[in-house]
Amino acid sequence: MNEGNGFASKSGMTVSIENSSPVISAVTDSSGNFTLPLDPSLHSFALVYTKPGFGTFKRYYMRDASNKIYYVDNNSPYQTENASESLGSKSTVTINSFSASIIGDALRLTSNISSPNASGEKYIRILYQKDLPGISINTVDKTKTNWSHLLPVTNGDNSFDVCLACSTICADWKPGDKIYLAAYGDSFYSNMYQDQTTSKIFLPNLNPNTNVIPVSIIVP
């Protein structure tokens, strides 16, 4: 996929078994299909999906006692027949300015963005966290339910209102809370995944280049 919701070429994606030595990998064909030889003695493994200009994605798998393979998501096994990957491209969006303010019963988010792509879908990811002055993609607590959300944008100025009383984003905010916010360019398909070894959550398509510092609001 491109950085929006549009299709890109299905060919040329490299799929490899993580930590295999020698490296076991395959490249997708024009239909997006690939074949990997798998050692029958391998009971758990991760597949790594990469393509130039696209974010890296990992998916974890396990083999049960009956030799059936499942993929693992949020510590739960699922049948591989239901597994499909949509690899998104990296975001081209740079945040030039970002602000947040309370307007009536809404949180107004305004931004100015630039991208070399004049047309096509573009998105920014807004981060939220209470009492975190240095909020960034590296410091925000990604285990929280409402730590971020994605907004569509166009080159230039953008404005978006979030209902304080009805949005799930604000569900655990209380009057007087100081909420810190930051913004980054991201893609519709963020390729977000949690590393099973470190438990860290990664957003491979996020553009870390932002020209603005975090902002804050006081919940009325």
Which positions does each model-derived feature cover?
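A short, amphipathic beta-strand motif
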Residues: M1-G4, G32
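Short, ordered, surface-exposed loop/turn motifs in non-cytosolic proteins
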Residues: E3-N19, P40-L42, G120-Y123
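Short, acidic Ser/Thr/Gly-rich low-complexity loop/linker segments typical of extracellular
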Residues: S21-N33
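A short, solvent-exposed beta-strand micro-motif common in secreted/extracellular proteins
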Residues: L42-R63, Y184
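Structured interaction patches on ligand/partner-binding surfaces of diverse proteins
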Residues: F54-N82, N191-N205
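Extracellular beta-sheet/turn segments enriched in Thr/Pro/Gly and aliphatic residues
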Residues: A65-S99, I213-P220
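Ser/Thr/Gly/Pro-rich, low-complexity flexible regions
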Residues: S99-P220
